[in-house]
């Protein structure tokens, strides 16, 4: 930890409370963010981490906008929410599928993404769907809902960038940055969804955030 802190990160994202205690004992001034892998999805969880002097909580991706708004309006701690990127077929940070199938822990950043593979669906020993992407969620995209996300009280938008190509990160971040700036400048903004689709995606959904339940997986 000591050598890493020489970089002077603006904040560290963690899940392990034991690591949190170690970091705070040695580096009391560093800002700590609780990861989405902690599966924080209610006011009680947020208030608990606030009492532990966590600076920001990244909420679980399975929450909807009304639940998030209630938390933001009843808790003083900064709230961060995933607004764009891959979704997990399980609860974020709680999936054991990769560990069991590929012997790679998704909860340690080594997910083999077996949910992205094709599977067949059987009913009464009869194949009703053959080699379809039944467990592969579409990518979360909430660019059209930026005003509602801001009005909910969210302090930080989280955009997936790990292991993504520079053109993907650049295009997506640029689009959300523009949408946010237009909101605060009180200008009308129509996002160019077609432009965003030019970078890698699995099709777009508004996910659990806006209860887009019928448009979550690719081949359902």
Each predicted region: which residue ranges?
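Short, small-residue-biased leader/transition segments that mark boundaries at the very start
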Residues: 1-7
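Short active-site oxyanion
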Residues: 8-12, 55-57
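Conserved N-terminal glycine/acidic-rich loop preference
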Residues: 11-13, 45-46
């Amino acid at each position: 930890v000591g050598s890493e802190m020489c970089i002077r990160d603006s904040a560290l994202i963690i899940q392990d409370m034991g690591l949190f205690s170690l970091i705070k004992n040695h580096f009391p001034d560093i800002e700590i963010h609780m990861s989405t892998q902690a599966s924080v999805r209610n006011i009680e969880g947020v208030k608990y981490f606030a009492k532990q002097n966590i600076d920001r909580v990244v909420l679980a991706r399975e929450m909807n906008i009304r639940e998030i708004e209630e938390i933001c309006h009843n808790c003083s701690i900064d709230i961060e929410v995933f607004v764009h990127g891959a979704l997990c077929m399980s609860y974020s940070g709680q999936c054991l599928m990769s560990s069991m199938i590929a012997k790679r822990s998704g909860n340690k950043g080594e997910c083999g993404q077996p949910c992205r593979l094709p599977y067949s669906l059987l009913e009464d020993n009869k194949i009703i769907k053959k080699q379809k992407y039944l467990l592969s969620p579409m990518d979360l995209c909430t660019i059209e809902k930026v005003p509602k996300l801001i009005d909910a009280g969210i302090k930080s938008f989280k955009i997936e960038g790990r292991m993504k190509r520079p053109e993907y990160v650049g295009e997506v971040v640029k689009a959300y940055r523009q949408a946010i700036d237009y909101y605060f400048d009180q200008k009308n903004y129509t996002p160019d969804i077609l432009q965003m689709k030019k970078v890698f995606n699995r099709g777009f959904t508004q996910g659990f955030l806006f209860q887009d339940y019928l448009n979550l997986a690719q081949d359902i």
